[in-house]
Structure formats: C-alpha cells, structure tokens
C-alpha cells in the first residue's frame, strides 16, 4: 500500500489548518491518518511526508510575514553591531525591529531546550491516543483561561518585556506534547501577558518559524529514500499545506481581532473527549 494523492491533499489541508489555528496539528496528524486509513510505503516515506508538510507551513508563514522577517534580519545585524558601538540597550529601547528580534530569540530558547532534552521521551506519546485526547483537553483549558481571565491587553512591541517573551516561550515548549497546540499555547500566554490580541497572534506565528524549521531539520536525517516513493502525493500534500497554511494565518489574524477564541476551546474539548472515549472503548487506555 501507499499514500494516495487524495489522502496527501487531505493531510496537507489538515496540517495547514491546524498548524496555525489553535487546535494542535500534532494531534490531528495522529488522528486523521487513522480515520482515512493512510498507509505509507515505508517508514522513510512517512518521515519525508511529515517533513514536507512542515516545510509547507514554514513557507506559508515566511510568505505571509516576509516584510517582518526582513526587518527582523536587519534588526539582528544592526543590534549585533550596536554591541560593539556600546548602544545595544539603547537600540532595544528605541528600535521596535531590534526589540522584536531579541524577543523572538528569548522566546525560542525554551522550545529548543525542550526539543533537545525531552523529544525522545515525548515521541512515544504520539502512539498514545489517550494522551493525545488528554492534551487536547488541556489546550482547550488554556484557551478558555486566556479569554476568560484576560482576553489580551494593550501591550505593543515597545512595552513587551523579555520576561513576557520567556513565559510565552515556556508555553511553546509544552507543545512538544501531542495535543498541546503550539499556536494555542503561545497565543494564550501572550493574551495572559497583556499583549494586544493581534500582537499575541503575530508574535506566535513569527515564533513558529525557528521551531518548525528546527523540527524539519531534525527529521531530515531520517528521510532516507522516502522522497522516492509516490513523489506526486508528497508534492500534493506539500502544496496543500502551503496554500491552506497561508490562508489560515490570514483567517486567525482576522478572527482574533474581531472574535473570541472560545470556539477553538470548545472544539478541542469535543475532539479531546471523543478521543478519550474511543480510546477507552477500544481498550487503548
């Protein structure tokens, strides 16, 4: 058996939607393949396909925020030069691009540490449907708390502290568990930290870039001959993830400005509870 083009497109759509909407892409990429009976030609193809899906969403966020990324790169180079000029702190206070650059650096550290130290331990949970269901419930709770207790504030980049970035980064590190939404946890942390709603989402998406890129790089070594099997399906999934991912970013940025994220909390609770119930019925708990 081999993954079909239709199955690949479905999984690409799922990845594109759930990577940026706060409902956990890892959970859906565990559950959906079982629902549509995906069979890979070999383990290498599974790794190759997963890597391409993540590269698709990586390109989506880069394409959407390319102007911000250019400013961030310029800010990084300029702030490094500021160190030698003795103007590093002044630059962080006066230049939003420099400040955002280092807020992203600080926010990335916890996930990088968690990935190095805990990835193998959490890898086994991707085959544990009960764990996926439980962590989906937790994602729903995070979204509910962030909306009910705070719902965001009025902090802009210039007011955002490195402590805020570290806290958001720690929440992102929790997303190493399947079912904990990376975007959901970071947006929730941003709202609880008092960030403007749109900034919380924007910072979350920019913070995704090094994390998605890092995860893809880690998987590259395990691809092997995976790219040689049914290349058409792999490309179809990649393109679906890219296109839908781009549209999902646009959708969430619009939603977070105009509406509550509670609908995603309810969704996570429903899917999480259903997963736990089915796991219990089939003796998987």
Where do the model's predicted regions map?
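Multi-pass membrane proteins that catalyze or facilitate reactions on polyprenyl-/lipid-phosphate substrates
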Residues: 1-285
């Amino acid at each position: 058996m081999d993954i079909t083009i239709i199955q690949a497109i479905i999984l690409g759509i799922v990845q594109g939607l759930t990577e940026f909407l706060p409902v956990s892409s890892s959970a859906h990429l565990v559950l959906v393949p079982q629902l549509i009976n995906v069979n890979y030609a070999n383990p290498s193809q599974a790794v190759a396909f997963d890597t391409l899906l993540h590269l698709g969403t990586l390109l989506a966020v880069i394409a959407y925020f390319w102007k911000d990324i250019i400013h961030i790169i310029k800010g990084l180079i300029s702030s490094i030069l500021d160190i030698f000029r003795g103007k590093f702190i002044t630059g962080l206070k006066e230049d939003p691009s420099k400040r955002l650059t280092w807020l992203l650096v600080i926010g990335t550290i916890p996930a990088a540490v968690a990935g190095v130290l805990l990835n193998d331990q959490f890898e086994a949970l991707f085959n544990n449907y009960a764990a996926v269901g439980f962590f989906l419930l937790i994602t729903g709770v995070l979204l509910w708390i962030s909306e009910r207790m705070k719902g965001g504030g009025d902090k802009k980049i210039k007011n955002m502290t490195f402590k805020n970035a570290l806290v958001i980064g720690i929440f992102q590190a929790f997303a190493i568990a399947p079912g904990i939404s990376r975007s959901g946890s970071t947006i929730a942390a941003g709202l609880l930290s008092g960030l403007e709603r749109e900034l919380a989402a924007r910072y979350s998406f920019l913070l995704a870039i090094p994390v998605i890129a890092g995860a893809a790089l880690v998987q590259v070594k395990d691809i092997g001959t995976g790219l040689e099997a049914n290349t058409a399906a792999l490309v179809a999934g990649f393109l679906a993830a890219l296109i839908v991912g781009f549209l999902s970013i646009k959708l969430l940025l619009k939603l977070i400005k105009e509406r509550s994220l509670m609908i995603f909390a309810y969704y996570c609770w429903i899917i999480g509870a259903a997963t736990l119930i089915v796991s219990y019925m089939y003796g998987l708990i």
